[in-house]
Amino acid sequence: MKINIDEKLETTEILIETQDDLWYIKNILNPGDIIEGIAYRRLEKRNDLERSKSTERIPIKVKIKIENLDFQPFTDKIKILGIIIDGDFSGEHQSIMYGPGDTLKIYKNLNEAERDFLNEAVKNEYSSGMIFVSLDEEAADIYLMRSYSLQDMAHIESNKTGKRYDLKYNEKQYFLDIIKALKNIKNVFLLIVLGTGFEPEKLYNEIKKDPFFNNIDVKFYNTYDTGKSGVYNLLNSDATSNIIKESRMAKEKRILETFLRNLNSGLSVYGYDEINNYLDNGAIDTLIISEEKFKMPETRELLNKASGIKIYIISNYTEPGEIIRSFGGYCAILRYKIK
């Protein structure tokens, strides 16, 4: 993502570069916000001789007051729907699709938290390209790390199940199927193999033999669990601290654990009103907000008080996000307890 902020006009122009950029955009836009983009409208022309109408779509620049956003995880488009507020089509409904390569102009005075949030995408700190293969003797799951979640890429069965599994199971074919699926994923720079039993290490050795993976950093870790749980646990382990500790999901996991650990000591609080009171007292060190609460109008009141405080926006699509939502979407870690 590239952004250009005009302080005088209170506009932000965004060049969308990746799929993940769409998630960031979704979380700073709300109904009522104004955007500018290119829409394709039909112009009617009357043929005087045939008295018929023909139509064609032409690109026009329009300003839209947003009514709704349609964002689907792991897709390359976001759909913005609203009402045109200027020009010949003023008052008419319009939708615009945005994806990588498009430019979006927002007429909005972004607050400090929203700017910091967009700067994550600008710095490309959590770019895609990190793949996890989590497996055991029965099945393998392949995940692509996104900024906001793990994307399911493939599920491969080994056929090593049932009383007569030995008639169907072929370990070599199992590994070949996994490797074939991995080769279909583009722009990978880090591949992490994890899981239980002997299969993860065997797969790792097969991958290392394949010249296709020569330019990819391949790692192997034994874990106590498989699937997404295995990946989440690995993200927060000391074993990977020097490799993936700066991933967004690893940070979310650490922040959540600190919040939960401090609940018993009174150094963690939750709930909008409770946090609002602690902000007034200057006692909050870290403010943790769920993705959907970040977009709420009342949240801006909290953020206006939170200057200089560490703020984390937690994705809805992760385990930490689900837990933060169960606490009402507003959580905080305190500098000190107030009696």
Swiss-Prot record:
The keyword Protein transport does not apply. One of its GO terms (molecular function) is metal ion binding. It is found in: Cytoplasm. Disulfide bonds: none annotated. SMART domains: eRF1_1. Its EC number is 3.1.-.-. It holds the Pfam family eRF1_1. The keyword Coiled coil does not apply. One of its GO terms (biological process) is ribosome disassembly. InterPro entries: eFR1_2_sf (IPR042226), eRF1_1_Pelota (IPR005140), eRF1_3 (IPR005142), Pelota/DOM34_N (IPR038069), Pelota_arc (IPR023521), Ribosomal_eL30-like_sf (IPR029064), Transl-rel_pelota (IPR004405). It is an enzyme of class 3 (hydrolase). GO terms for cellular component: cytoplasm. The N-terminal domain has the RNA-binding Sm fold. It harbors the endoribonuclease activity. Belongs to the eukaryotic release factor 1 family. Pelota subfamily. This is Protein pelota homolog. It comes from Picrophilus torridus (strain ATCC 700027 / DSM 9790 / JCM 10055 / NBRC 100828 / KAW 2/3). The lineage of its organism: Archaea, Methanobacteriati, Thermoplasmatota, Thermoplasmata, Thermoplasmatales.
